């Protein structure tokens, strides 16, 4: 070995550099232990940036000495003494590990021992205590194999050599080697890396071994970050990350004598574990239970209670984790495919060197993300285990051409798509339990209603096909078309609508809560009547229940007597009803024009009004606001009912008390007994009472003053017969030209209605028939004797009205097809004609909408789309003919061009 160059220290560093850094040079005659002590105390790799230049010079000297030693070994001038040994208890594995070798003879010749050690390869220089000669420790050719001895020990076999319990079974051959360091590196089959290197755990004496692939020598600590290489990661199928930490066992408090006496028959608690053993095993379905491959094994005692082991296990098979606490039996945990980011390896001791040579056991390369960890139950008190894994493409076969690794992304969702989602989710605010219950009740009711409507359409189609005597092939075809229509309707209901989809043509009406406008749909160019209600006014005047009832009856209505609803939607300020446009005007406008109707014309309108009321009652509603303003006339002179703003369906969603104040919704009558019933018998079931009574009466004061029934004003309870009172008042106004109980003073009209016997005047009746006067008297009377109030069902009660002598000769079946000279036919030139309405200019309020009305749960389930909205028109009465019959097609193969004179509005 050549002497140290002048101006250099024994470790190869320049004395000038040491003086520049303010460090005193080390004497050349210092012993190896003193030098190592000084080296460990002064030079700490990666700690003091001021030492970087010194370390660089040391590494250069180290490389120069390695070349000389290689030449010296080639000449065979050195031999390894048989008495040389390596003390594993003196080996530590830190950022730089130093090994002390002792020789049995101080005068022995300088020798070089060849030991495969990753820790030694990271050291800068080594010296012997005796002759002062340097010892170059180079890796030796070893191919590590693994076997289980059954005693939780890892045994490695290297040809004819074996290392057991940290002691070499045979000494290293002293035969001179003529091979250089570069020529003895091993490249195991199936691995891309070179130089297998055993390592040593710093916390115990058992040797630990690194993977079959080796890492290149560590780069200079002052090198550029670009040259810094991370630990390579092999391609894996299921990557499971295990994070294990052992805590010191907390001593239990002194036992309580009372508890000891109480639990004297119980077994004493086990002693605190002196050691925690962690092992990781993998099993495949092809292998048996007795052929388990152990990937990792380590032991940690009390001295290393704060140490942490963090590894990754990559295996397509089941992986088992055995955690044993001596003297307790071991426990097993099955690793599931859970994903987590890898933990930063800088947090753990000997992280790189505790890995077995197996491609399924790979190091961690990502940053720490402790929030994703999930602890496993039933673990020892002093051991923490957290794990997760993620699925990855299967690893390529080494005997086949390897494919490029898959591209890994940090997040499966693009940031541009994720930001709007996060922004919108912040707008979601928690709600009160009553509000959630309110929404769920309405939502479930709407789902049930949609199911009933779908079944109804199916039965109606089957009934029509039976009446048309269609063959089975045609029936199946029609049923298939209906299913396609149902699917399309389901998709249409999910599409959100807004006011921007329509263009306002003119405003034709105004009410207490909103206005009515003639609009045109932008995509179909069809004309509709749009009724808009301001949410703030609806909430302030407590009309949410009435709006809900109006929406329900318009959505459920399937009759030519009712104005059809096509869409309903809402925005932050208003509720919108998109309805059928009836261009003939209303009955009030006609009364103003004519003054008094002829008896035949009055009979015709009252007969059609009776049919409309019958339909409303059949679907379970009460209009409660019948007046000439709410009776529209189509272009053929027939009537349609509209404005169901005060309608009630005798349902809990139509009860104003159910809505209550905002965010405080209580169904006061849904699951509670009436006071009079509860006082009689408390054992009566709620459902039985609700089924029997079915909300027979209502108690709210509604309707227009001149047409209200006396029981409505007195709040004694009213039922469907109140609509027949309003019918009698309308008939009186038609034939007499005035309302019967009008008074100009406030409250005078209600006083006259309550005392109707004193104020009902039949003078100046003109040429009215006795039957007409009798009809008025039997409608404007007490509810007990009123027409339409007796009978078990709606049909029987309505028959009392239809069978009156005044209606003798009325064809109730073909009433809507009636064409007569006395029928008023409004003048309509085109579908956007508004000459029969009084138009006005819109004066929209510029005020911001009331915040209380924006997210009020009273408007849940308000959106609606008609089933036939795709093939219907805004003004159905303008359609020239009804749908063609399929019978001529089946009989003659062609359609019959002739169509009957049937009103097409009933076929939309």
Swiss-Prot record:
Keyword terms of this UniProt record: ATP-binding, Cell membrane, Coiled coil, Cytoplasm, Developmental protein, Kinase, Magnesium, Membrane, Metal-binding, Nucleotide-binding, Phosphoprotein, Serine/threonine-protein kinase, Transferase
Comp. bias intervals (Low complexity): 115-125, 168-181
Recorded phenotype for the gene knockout or disruption: RNAi-mediated knockdown results in larval lethality in 50 percent of the animals. Surviving knockdown animals have several defects including a slower growth and a partial distortion of the pharynx. In surviving L3 animals seam cells are 30 percent smaller.
Localisation per UniProt entry: Cytoplasm; Apical cell membrane
Obligatory cofactor(s): Mg(2+)
UniProt binding sites for ATP: 508-516, 531
The EC number(s) this enzyme carries: 2.7.11.1
Catalytic activity: L-seryl-[protein] + ATP = O-phospho-L-seryl-[protein] + ADP + H(+); L-threonyl-[protein] + ATP = O-phospho-L-threonyl-[protein] + ADP + H(+)
Gene Ontology molecular function: ATP binding; metal ion binding; protein serine kinase activity; protein serine/threonine kinase activity; transcription coactivator binding
CDD domains: MobB_LATS, STKc_LATS
EC supergroup of this enzyme: transferase
Active site: 625
GO cellular component, one term: membrane
GO BP annotations listed: apical protein localization; defecation; G1/S transition of mitotic cell cycle; hippo signaling; negative regulation of protein import into nucleus; nematode larval development; positive regulation of apoptotic process; post-embryonic digestive tract morphogenesis
Expressing tissues: Expressed in muscles and epithelial tissues including pharynx, intestine and hypodermis. Expressed in vulval and spermathecal seam cells.
SMART domains in UniProt: S_TK_X, S_TKc
Keyword Cytoplasm: yes
Annotated region described as Disordered, given as residue ranges: 115-134, 162-183, 203-225, 388-412
Function summary: Phosphorylates yap-1 which may negatively regulate yap-1 nuclear localization. Plays an essential role in larval development. Regulates growth, the formation of gut granules, lifespan and cell and body sizes probably in synergy with the TGF-beta sma/mab pathway. Does not appear to regulate apoptosis and proliferation. In addition, may synergize with the TGF-beta daf-7 dauer pathway to regulate entry into the dauer stage. Maintains the cellular integrity of intestinal cells by regulating the localization of apical actin and junctional proteins.
Assembly notes: Interacts (via N-terminus) with yap-1 (via WW domain).
Family statement drawn from the similarity comment of this UniProt entry: Belongs to the protein kinase superfamily. AGC Ser/Thr protein kinase family.
Protein name: Serine/threonine-protein kinase WARTS homolog
Native source species: Caenorhabditis elegans
């Amino acid at each position: 070995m050549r002497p140290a160059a002048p101006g250099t220290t024994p470790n190869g560093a320049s004395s000038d550099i040491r003086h520049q850094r303010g460090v005193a040079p080390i004497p050349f005659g210092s012993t190896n232990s003193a030098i190592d002590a000084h080296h460990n105390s002064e030079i700490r790799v990666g700690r003091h940036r001021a030492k970087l230049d010194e370390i660089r010079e040391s590494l250069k000297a180290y490389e120069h000495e390695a070349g000389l030693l290689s030449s010296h070994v080639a000449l065979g001038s050195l031999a390894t003494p048989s008495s040389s040994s390596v003390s594993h208890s003196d080996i530590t594995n830190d950022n730089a590990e130093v090994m002390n070798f002792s020789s049995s003879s101080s005068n022995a010749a300088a020798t070089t021992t060849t030991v495969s050690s990753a820790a030694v390869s990271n050291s800068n220089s080594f010296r012997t205590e005796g002759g002062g000669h340097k010892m170059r420790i180079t890796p030796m050719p070893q191919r590590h194999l693994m076997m289980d001895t059954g005693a939780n020990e890892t045994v490695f076999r290297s040809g004819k050599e074996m290392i057991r319990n940290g002691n070499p079974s045979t000494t290293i051959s002293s035969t001179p080697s003529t091979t250089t360091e570069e020529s003895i590196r091993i490249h195991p089959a199936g691995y891309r890396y070179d130089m297998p290197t055993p390592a040593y755990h710093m916390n115990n004496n058992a040797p630990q071994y690194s993977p079959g692939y080796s890492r290149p020598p560590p780069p200079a600590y002052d090198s550029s970050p670009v040259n810094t290489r991370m630990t390579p990661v092999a391609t894996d199928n299921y990557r499971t990350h295990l994070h294990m930490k052992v805590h010191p066992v907390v001593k239990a408090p002194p036992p309580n004598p009372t508890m000891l006496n109480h639990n004297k028959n119980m077994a004493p608690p086990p002693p605190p574990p002196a050691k925690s053993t962690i092992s990781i095993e993998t099993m495949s379905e092809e292998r048996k239970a007795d052929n388990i491959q152990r990937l990792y094994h380590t032991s940690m005692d009390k001295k290393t209670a704060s140490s942490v082991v963090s590894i990754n296990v990559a295996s397509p098979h089941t992986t088992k984790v055995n955690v044993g606490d001596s003297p307790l039996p071991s426990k097993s945990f099955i690793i599931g495919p859970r994903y987590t980011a890898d933990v930063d390896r800088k947090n753990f001791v000997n992280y790189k060197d505790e890995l077995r040579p197996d491609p399924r056991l790979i190091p961690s390369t990502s940053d720490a993300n402790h929030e994703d960890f999930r602890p496993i139950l039933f673990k020892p008190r002093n051991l923490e285990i957290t794990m997760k894994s993620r699925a990855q493409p299967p690893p390529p076969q080494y005997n086949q051409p390897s494919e490029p690794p898959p591209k890994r992304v940090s997040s499966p969702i693009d940031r541009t798509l994720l930001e709007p989602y996060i922004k919108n989710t912040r707008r979601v605010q928690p709600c009160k339990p009553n509000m959630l219950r309110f929404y769920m009740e309405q939502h479930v009711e709407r789902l049930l209603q949609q199911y009933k409507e779908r079944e109804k359409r199916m039965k109606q189609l089957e009934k029509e096909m039976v009446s048309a005597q269609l063959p089975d092939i045609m029936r199946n075809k029609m049923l298939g078309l209906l299913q396609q229509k149902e699917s399309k309707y389901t998709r249409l209901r999910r599409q959100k609508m807004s006011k921007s989809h329509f263009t306002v043509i003119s405003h034709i009406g105004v009410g207490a809560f909103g206005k009515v406008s003639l609009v045109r749909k932008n995509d179909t160019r069809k004309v509709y009547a749009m009724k808009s209600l301001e949410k703030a006014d609806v909430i302030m005047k407590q009309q949410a229940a009435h709006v809900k009832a109006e929406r329900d009856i318009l959505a459920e209505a399937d009759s030519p007597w009712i104005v059809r609803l096509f869409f309903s939607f809402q925005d932050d300020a208003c509720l919108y009803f998109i309805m059928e446009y009836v261009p003939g005007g209303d009955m009030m406008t006609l009364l103003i024009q004519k003054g008094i109707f002829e008896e035949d014309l009055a009979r015709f309108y009252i007969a059609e009004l009776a049919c409309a009321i019958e339909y409303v009652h059949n679907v379970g509603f009460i209009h409660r606001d019948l007046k000439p303003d709410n009776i529209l006339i189509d272009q053929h002179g027939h009537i349609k009912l509209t404005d169901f703003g005060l309608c009630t369906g005798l349902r809990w969603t139509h009860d104003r008390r159910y809505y209550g104040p905002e965010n405080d919704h209580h169904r006061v009558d849904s699951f509670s007994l009436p006071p009079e019933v509860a006082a009689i018998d408390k054992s009566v079931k709620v459902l039985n009472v609700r089924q029997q009574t079915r909300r027979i009466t209502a108690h709210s004061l509604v309707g227009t003053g001149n047409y209200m029934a006396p029981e409505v004003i007195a709040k004694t309870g009213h039922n469907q017969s109140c609509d027949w009172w309003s019918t009698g008042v309308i008939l009186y106004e038609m034939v007499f030209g005035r309302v019967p109980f009008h008074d100009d003073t406030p409250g005078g009209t209600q006083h006259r209605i309550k005392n109707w016997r004193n104020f009902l005047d039949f003078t100046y009746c003109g040429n009215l028939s006795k039957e007409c006067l009798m009809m008025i008297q039997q409608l404007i009377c007490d509810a007990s004797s009123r027409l339409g109030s007796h009978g078990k069902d709606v049909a029987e009660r309505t028959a009392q009205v239809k069978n009156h002598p005044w209606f003798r000769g009325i064809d109730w079946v073909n009433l809507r097809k009636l064409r007569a000279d006395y029928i008023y036919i409004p003048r309509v030139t085109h579908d956007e004609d508004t000459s029969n309405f009084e138009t006005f200019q819109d004066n929209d309020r510029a005020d911001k909408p009331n915040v209380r009305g924006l997210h009020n749960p009273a408007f849940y389930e308000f959106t609606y789309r008609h089933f036939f909205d795709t093939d219907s028109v805004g003004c159905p009465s303008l359609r020239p003919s009804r749908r063609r019959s399929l019978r001529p097609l089946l009989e003659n193969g062609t359609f019959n061009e002739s169509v009957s004179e049937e009103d097409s509005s009933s076929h939309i």
